[in-house]
């Protein structure tokens, strides 16, 4: 098992990777008012960030295999912090989006490196436990982030961006930890052939499709549409939106905390099927909930779906390859995440503009059905489990 300093770095990187979107969700309506934006235009503050992440994630995976984890991690932390600081001084919406692109360039490597570092530091026996703890810790962060973002947003929409400076002490900590060294000269032909063979496996494709759909169900109807609906329908302030939205993270934390016990009894497919129902059911009635605080129940269930599904998918993807090609495989998975995070906010914003909130949540319901179908038809009852 890794030491305390190693674990602190690991959890710190995971918390930062979850901060880029959840911290600013409560101030999206305030941004829209300040700059006179539509729902789709306001959603670009998420899309620009996640598109930059999606671009950098596969690059970061290969570079960390070739040049070592530190050569990628340290610059990523500095760029991530720098982009957030620049947002504090942005004068126009165009400036905000440019700063978010810069920040996303730094965030891309963080999203894949926390899983790579976990797989480097922890043996296969203990990896599921660590992945569950990483998700639980991340969920604790995402409980706090919307609340902090909402409270700071009462002062100014810019204020939450100051929190991104927490990447700077994490960068200092990374200098004190011994990370995986560069491999030196690589046989690129063998590297890509071996990686390609793994990526073409049915299980691997199933994992990547699942992770795409899971994040689509999160970032479209929940992360993008709910804050805008909360202001339009319930006239909620940034702080109230942040408090209610924190129930997503509470559900995710509790589900992830209990996941190791559930994983010991249930197969991968069973867990994903349960998660699929938890993704689907809240979206069936979220648009018709009569009050803001009653939305906490479907948001909690949606968060539980994340806590049940994402850690075990990441766990299984991390064990697909060898240490030599692990980063490239995880980078493909994280790229699927970032593409989903980029496409779904824009898509669901357009749907909500044309068919209102009922249309957006009905589309999210359809995504949940797809998760159930993939889990049922791609994976066997006792396969794709990290217990193997």
Predicted regions and their residues:
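Structural signature of the two symmetry-related core transmembrane helices
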Residues: 72-85, 270-284
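A late C-terminal transmembrane helix in Major Facilitator Superfamily
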Residues: 323-355
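Juxtamembrane intracellular "pre-TM" segments in multi-pass secondary transporters
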Residues: 179-208
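Conserved MFS/SLC helix-loop-helix module at the cytosolic interface between two early adjacent transmembrane helices
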Residues: 55-91
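Cytoplasmic helix-loop-helix junction between adjacent transmembrane helices
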Residues: 99-138
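Helix-breaking motifs and short loop linkers at transmembrane-helix boundaries and internal kinks
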Residues: 36, 68, 89-95, 235, ...
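Helix-loop-helix hairpin linking two adjacent transmembrane segments in secondary transporters
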Residues: 133-176
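Helix-to-loop junctions at the C-terminal end of transmembrane segments
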Residues: 57-68, 255-267
């Amino acid at each position: 098992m890794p030491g305390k300093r190693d674990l602190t770095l690991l959890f710190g990187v995971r918390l930062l990777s979850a901060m880029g979107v959840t911290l600013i969700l409560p101030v999206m309506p305030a941004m829209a008012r300040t700059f006179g934006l539509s729902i789709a235009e306001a959603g670009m503050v998420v899309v620009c960030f996640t598109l930059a992440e999606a671009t950098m994630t596969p690059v970061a995976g290969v570079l960390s295999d070739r040049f070592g984890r530190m050569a990628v991690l340290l610059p990523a932390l500095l760029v991530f912090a720098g982009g957030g600081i620049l947002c504090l001084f942005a004068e126009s919406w165009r400036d905000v989006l440019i700063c978010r692109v810069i920040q996303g360039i730094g965030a891309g490597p963080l999203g894949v490196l926390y899983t790579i570092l976990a797989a480097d530091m922890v043996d296969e026996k203990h990896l599921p436990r660590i992945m569950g703890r990483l998700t639980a810790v991340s969920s604790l962060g995402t409980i706090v982030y919307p609340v902090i973002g909402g409270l700071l947003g009462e002062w100014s929409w810019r204020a939450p961006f100051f929190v991104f400076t927490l990447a700077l002490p994490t960068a200092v900590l990374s200098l004190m930890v011994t990370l995986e060294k560069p491999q030196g000269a690589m046989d690129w032909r063998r590297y890509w052939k071996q990686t390609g063979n793994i990526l073409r496996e049915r299980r691997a494709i199933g994992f990547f499709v699942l992770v795409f759909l899971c994040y689509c169900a999160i970032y479209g109807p929940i992360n993008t549409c709910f804050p805008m609906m909360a202001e339009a329908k319930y006239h909620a302030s940034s702080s109230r939106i942040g408090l209610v939205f924190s129930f997503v993270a509470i559900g995710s934390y509790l589900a992830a905390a209990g996941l190791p016990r559930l994983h010991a009894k249930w197969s991968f497919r069973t867990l994903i099927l349960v998660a699929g129902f938890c993704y689907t059911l809240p979206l069936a009635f979220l648009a018709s909930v009569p009050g803001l605080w009653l939305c906490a129940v479907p948001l909690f269930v949606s968060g539980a779906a994340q806590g049940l599904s994402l850690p075990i998918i990441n766990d299984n993807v991390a064990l697909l390859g060898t240490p030599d090609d692990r980063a490239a495989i995880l980078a493909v998975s994280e790229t699927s995440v970032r593409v989903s995070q980029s496409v779904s906010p824009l898509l669901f914003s357009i749907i909500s503009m044309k068919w209102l909130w009922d249309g957006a949540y009905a589309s999210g319901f359809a995504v949940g059905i797809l998760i159930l179908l993939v889990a049922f038809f791609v994976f066997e009852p006792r396969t794709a489990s990290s217990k193997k």
